[in-house]
From Swiss-Prot:
Residues 1-45 form a transit peptide. Coiled coil: none annotated. This is Altered inheritance of mitochondria protein 9, mitochondrial. Keywords: Mitochondrion, Transit peptide. Belongs to the AIM9 family. Residues 619-639 are annotated as: Disordered. It is found in: Mitochondrion. InterPro entries: Kinase-like_dom_sf (IPR011009), Mito_inheritance_9 (IPR051035).
Amino acid sequence: MLMSKAPKLGNLLSKNSIKIVSGSKLRCNLKYINVRYISDTPDKVFTKLSDENDPQRDAFFKYSWGSWMKNDAIEKEKRVTKFSIEGLNDVLNDIYEQTKVEAKVTKEGAIKPPSFNKNLTVSLPHNLTVKNIGVINPNEKVQITSMASIHEGKHHRIYKIDTNLGKSFVLRVPYALENEDTIAQRLKSEVASMDFADLKLGIKVPKTYCFGINGLNPIRQPFILQEYIDGKLLMRDWSPLENDTSDGKPPVALQDVINKLSEFQSKLISMKFNGFGSIYFAKDAEELENVPELYDNETNEELKGRWKLGYSVERCLWKKKSFLPTDKLKTFLGPWSINKPTDIIRATGLLEAENAKVRLGLKEADSSSEAVESGVLKSQVATFENLVKLAPSLINSETKSIPNISDLLLPRLKHPDLDPMNVLVTENNEVYLLDFEGSSIKPLILQNAPQFVAYDGPKVYNIEKEVPDYEKLSDSEKAQYEFMYKRTRNQFLWEMAFNKTNPEFISIVAPPVKLLRSPYIAAIERKTDEEYILVDEAMIQLKEIWDIFTKNGLVKNSPYPIEYTTEQLEQHGKDLLKFHEKLISQPFAATQGWIPQDMFENLVAGGVLVKNKSGDYEVSSEAQSEVQSEVQSSTENKD
């Protein structure tokens, strides 16, 4: 049986698929869709199911959604997700057998602890029901019938798995961007966080059936096997730069997207925890002693002791930390006491400073191939040591100027990617939240707005009232103000929705509170080595208003804990200008040289990107001249 149409998950793009044909000679039909949308006419390539080394399978596992201007082959190799299809088939048969056993011995609706299986996978028995898993004829084996790669994300790849159970599954395979210990830790916490959100917070999430934390399981990759949700991504309804309606109101679809995500946010922060860190199943955090219960007053006996507070898996604390031994790294990851909310800031600064020192030592010993200047690493050390100095004084826990300050400092669950891309809506209008990777428990006052609405640029609330002679401006100038207005509008709509669901916490969006946490936010949202400059900028800006904050009781101590010389401030100004010029003059600097594949191919075909002697790509001299002219023009206009 051949597949005539590519499978889909909402509007996730389907790149290629495998069709498995049952019979005496099992073989796969690999289908490659070489366009960036769902095609009805995929190409077909056959391979034997039992031949794991068939080269015709390789494209199914290779990364294909983008290219890098530098080290493209190396970056793509890190994102190859080759796994054992036969092993996946074995895992599916194993959870099916568990489902049959659970149906016989377990009361319907019972919640049993996770099952740590002999094949080095972990299954969640309460999700292994006939309704969820499906059925086959007696003596028949579970058989994968087709597979499709439906999403290649930043951190993992998603496959849709069809079977003879009459059910589809989702297989999530993380990229090997970090070491094995890091991936295992994050994966354990991700599954436990989703389990907690489902059973304790009442958030709809795809049910997890089974997971493995390393390559020793039958699939030979770390993985999560989940429920397949047939729906559309909420991102389809998100048009952030859409115009207001004719009567001056925001678009209905825009407001609806924000409302749905705000409802998730309200549930996530509804529970108070007993410490800061991340959520794990109890057995996965056994090494930690003297850790308080995750939360108090559990009345359901089946949930008592199910989860435990453990090391934080917030992305910034693990990203690019492979130079540090795991045991050393864990000393910076908590969990932290409920009575010391700013210890998270201090630990972040200590970790980043230590990581920069180790990298610098390797660089100076010619033992590192990293493309980073020693001067940048030295500056990082100074920056993050300053953040350590600032942390204890940053927030006055007894201030009267911030309403409900004690509640804002309590531990609350943070989903790191609260975004329309991570929400699925079914035909029945059921709304599911996806991708809990990197979830952590931290003070609400240190949680920034989600990235899809976050905006730190100039605020414009009403163009006609706030922009003099707007109608006389050029089209390009009008477009700039329109952009500012719409970004301001979107953030304001989010804050209004937040106030509607959680009015007692609205102080976290107040401008002074945003300024207080800005150095920490700049540190945890840092994407490149050079962005330490943004942490410096936030600390320097805070210094300018520190005395005012002290008089109003917002902060603990005066004078400001960090001293800057005139020379340091002047150098910072030069470095900041240079940093912004680089972002403008070097296309894709903000994405570390990554370019969506369609755009990459078009730029190469158009001669904008050319390959140099080292095999990397760079902007052609003609295109670079145009960019530099634009940068010079914009700088002159600014002056």
